[in-house]
Amino acid sequence: VSLWSLPFAGLLLSIALLPLLTPHFWEHHFCKVAAFWVLAFLVPCAVAAGFSIAAQAVLHIFLLEYVPFILLLFTLFVVAGGIKVSGNLVGTPGTNTAMLAFGTLSASFLGTPGASMVLIRPMIRANQDRNYNIHVFVFFIFLVANIGGSLTPLGDPPLFVGFLKGVDFLWTLGTMLAPMLFVSGILLALFYLIDRLAWNRESSGVKAKSAATRQIRVEGLHNVLYLFAVALTVLASGIWHRDATFPLGLGIELPLNGLVRDVILVALALLSWRTTKRAIRREMFWLTNSGAKSSLALKL
């Protein structure tokens, strides 16, 4: 293993372990920890290869990989956050399993952040009266926030970085479809068994609510069109290969297709923000107050 990979390994281990071992320290100093590992790579790189090479590497990664990566996440976050699913769903084993299955399948097209944002609110509401619900959100993280995004570059951020490097848009779909369905099927079956056992322990009052007629309401449906536009924009940027570039100095050139893609993504995010009712977005955790949060508190 190359010594150059050690700072990256250290960063991953810090993200995985420090929140568990020293949560207070991590909460207040995670930026400093990240900066430490960045410098642990950059300083030796500048000494060994020269300052210009190190600066070129940083600018290349930042402008051609990190910025497009963040812009895609930002757009999916804003657009998916404008879709609100509400109703009187009760978190029965069948309902929870169906919601997890839908979220898993949609995550590759909404993105794992987008699918999680769309489904977490109805999932919380459906299970807020249950006394045994921790496992629901553990499997939600496994399926919707992780495995579900394995089929397209839209689904999982690292796959999008691979797409920026030249990996075909549909390569992951052909390669990962069978493994994804196999693993998801096992987890969904396991979840249903666990949730059925937990449901049998619930009070009669909770079970009685499941007999009511289901009513589901979806607001902000126009954002689905924006999501399709996001998918088409990313796909087109991979198909449209143009030689035109913008020189940025230090040997870095910004491809025209990437620039057009990023501008369109930002425009779609702004359109979604302007055309979606603010009341829908106020219910998201990133715009809500502590009182609204407490109303959705889980019985853990």
Task: Briefly describe each language-model feature range.
Residues 227-300:
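Transmembrane helical segments that form the transport core of multi-pass membrane transport proteins
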Residues 1-4, 25-34, 54-68, 169-179, ...:
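Interfacial loop-to-helix junctions that mark the boundaries of transmembrane helices
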Residues 13-26, 76-91, 124-127, 191-200, ...:
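C-terminal ends of transmembrane helices
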Residues 20-24, 42-65, 74-92, 105-118:
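Transmembrane alpha-helix boundary signature
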Residues 132, 151, 171-212:
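Juxtamembrane and boundary regions of transmembrane helices in multi-pass small-molecule transporters
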Residues 1-4, 8, 39-43, 194-227, ...:
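Intrinsically disordered, low-complexity non-transmembrane regions of multi-pass membrane transporters
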Residues 7-18, 37-48, 73-81, 181-193, ...:
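Hydrophobic core segments of alpha-helical transmembrane domains in multi-pass membrane transport
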Residues 94-147:
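Hydrophobic transmembrane alpha-helices that form the pore/transport pathway of multi-pass ion
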